[in-house]
């Protein structure tokens, strides 16, 4: 049996693709009378993710998965919370991150937001803005790409939203996203 180092992350971050991969493994085992292990669903899920974003590079999908998991860990540590990776809010956040990685890969970051909007987001959500800047550092370190101010502002909104339900009982948190 092959062990996939990102198996837990794939199951959590790409639950839909993993379910499809598992169904494919089950179908192949039924049709071929074989005994492919369930962990092969991880490889199939990663191929589905890769195909869905047309990067053509599975290593980019592995990197994206690791960076997303690292970002979620940073958010949890920064806010002192545990994010429910099965929640709609976390799924929306992960979807945003996946499209961010596509924009990075295509060298097409958001950059057309007027400065007053970017500044308004920063002042409206100072804690989420600080956290988003930490996430931008991860992107810089892991992918060697500096995020634009517009991307960081957009990321700020998503950080505020993903943490809002987990932190709504705490004072002075950014919970209005």
Task: Please give the residue ranges for each predicted region.
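A cross-family "folded-core" feature that marks the main globular domain of proteins
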Residues: 1-177
């Amino acid at each position: 049996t092959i062990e996939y180092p990102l198996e837990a992350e794939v199951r959590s971050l790409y639950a839909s693709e993993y379910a499809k991969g598992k169904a494919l493994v089950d179908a192949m085992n039924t049709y071929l009378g074989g005994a492919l292990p369930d962990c092969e669903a991880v490889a199939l899920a990663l191929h589905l993710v890769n195909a869905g974003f047309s990067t053509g590079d599975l290593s980019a999908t592995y990197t994206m998965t690791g960076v997303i998991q690292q970002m979620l860990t940073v958010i949890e540590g920064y806010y002192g919370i545990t994010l429910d990776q099965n929640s709609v809010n976390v799924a929306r956040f992960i979807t945003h991150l996946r499209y961010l990685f596509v924009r990075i890969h295509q060298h097409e970051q958001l950059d057309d937001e007027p400065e007053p909007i970017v500044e308004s987001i920063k002042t409206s959500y100072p804690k989420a803005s600080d956290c988003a800047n930490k996430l931008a550092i991860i992107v810089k370190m892991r992918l060697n790409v500096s995020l634009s101010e517009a991307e960081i502002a957009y990321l700020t909104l998503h950080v505020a939203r993903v943490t809002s339900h987990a932190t709504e009982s705490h004072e002075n948190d950014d919970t209005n996203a």
